[in-house]
UniProtKB/Swiss-Prot annotation:
Gene from which this protein is expressed: ccmE
Region (Disordered): 132-157
Protein name: Cytochrome c-type biogenesis protein CcmE
Source organism: Pseudomonas syringae pv. tomato (strain ATCC BAA-871 / DC3000)
InterPro entries referenced in this protein's UniProt entry, alphabetically: CcmE, CcmE-like_sf, NA-bd_OB-fold
Summary of the function given for this chain in its UniProt record: Heme chaperone required for the biogenesis of c-type cytochromes. Transiently binds heme delivered by CcmC and transfers the heme to apo-cytochromes in a process facilitated by CcmF and CcmH.
């Protein structure tokens, strides 16, 4: 092989190696930032990965909110009306957080089936429901619950 061809081959191999390395790093970074949404039924059925950051959403069960008296620890149960999952959170809950309303919790699932959340998102107003929660409730056979101040037929629009 003459020196010119050898030099071109080395340059092409170096460029391909650099592109491959950059692509690997980019895909690795994207994989770390993907938070897949899981319903309480999917989590209870073992479809959600342990130790991986996920988004869990549903309706907060009435009477399930437990606050610690000496810390910011909070536990509550989220349901899709088929199955339920416990959410453990340390921090201040959003002002709009209420029992009986839809939330999305971001965190990791532990071996006991509890989602240890580092972020809790509450719906914005009485008509809003996170799209994932609304879809999950429809798929589970439950209509999107109507707020107390709205007639049921208006809530499904």
């Amino acid at each position: 092989m003459n020196p010119l061809r050898r030099k071109r081959l080395l340059i092409i191999l170096a460029v391909l190696g650099g592109v491959g390395l950059a692509l690997t790093l980019a895909l690795s970074a994207l994989k770390e930032n993907i938070n897949l949404f899981y319903t309480p039924s999917q989590i209870a059925n073992g479809q959600a990965p342990l130790g991986t950051r996920i988004r869990a959403g549903g309706m907060v069960e009435k009477g399930s909110l437990q606050r610690s008296t000496d810390s910011l620890d909070v536990r509550f149960v989220v349901t899709d009306f088929n199955k339920s999952v416990t959410i453990a959170y340390r921090g201040i809950l959003p002002d709009l957080f209420r029992e009986g309303q839809g939330i999305v919790a971001l965190g990791k699932l532990d071996a006991q089936g509890v989602v240890v959340a580092d972020e809790v998102l509450a719906k914005h107003d009485e008509k809003y429901m996170p799209p994932e929660v609304s879809k999950a409730l429809r798929e589970s056979g439950q209509a999107t619950p109507a707020p107390a101040s709205m007639p049921a037929r208006q809530a499904d629009r």
